[in-house]
Design a protein with these regions (language model features):
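Short, basic/polar amphipathic helix motif occurring as a linker/hinge flanking DNA-binding modules
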Residues: 80-91
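Active-site-adjacent bridging/hinge elements
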Residues: 2-3, 46
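Sigma70-family region 2
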Residues: 47-65, 83-85
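A short, charge-rich alpha-helical start-of-domain segment used by transcription regulators
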Residues: 4-29, 39-42
Length: 91
C-alpha cells in the first residue's frame, strides 16, 4: 500500500494561506487569553504557522488544519508559560 499523494507545493501553500487568513484572529485571541499578552500571542501563532509550513509539505495537509494550527499555538503558549514560571521561580 502506498502513502497518500501529497498536494503540490503551490497548492499546499495556498491551502495554508487560506486556513491562516480564516483562523489567525481566532488563534491569536485564544493564545492572548492564555498569555495575557497580545504581542506574544501573535508571535506564538506565527510560530504555529511556521511549524505548518515545515511539517505539512512532508506530512500532507491534516484532516483539520485549523485544529492543527490551534493546538500547535496552544502548546507553544503552554511552553512559554512554563518557561516564564520557571524564570520567575529562579529570580
Amino acid at each position: 500500500m502506498s502513502a497518500p499523494a501529497l498536494p503540490d507545493r503551490d497548492a499546499l501553500h495556498r491551502s495554508i494561506d487560506s486556513v491562516w487568513r480564516i483562523e489567525a484572529a481566532r488563534i491569536i485571541a485564544c493564545v492572548a487569553r492564555m498569555t495575557r499578552d497580545v504581542g506574544r500571542a501573535e508571535e506564538l501563532a506565527q510560530d504555529a504557522l511556521v511549524a505548518a509550513l515545515e511539517h505539512w509539505p512532508q506530512d500532507g495537509l491534516p484532516a483539520n488544519p485549523a485544529a492543527w494550527l490551534m493546538t500547535t499555538a496552544k502548546r507553544r503558549a503552554i511552553d512559554h508559560l512554563r518557561q516564564q514560571a520557571l524564570h520567575q521561580r529562579e529570580h
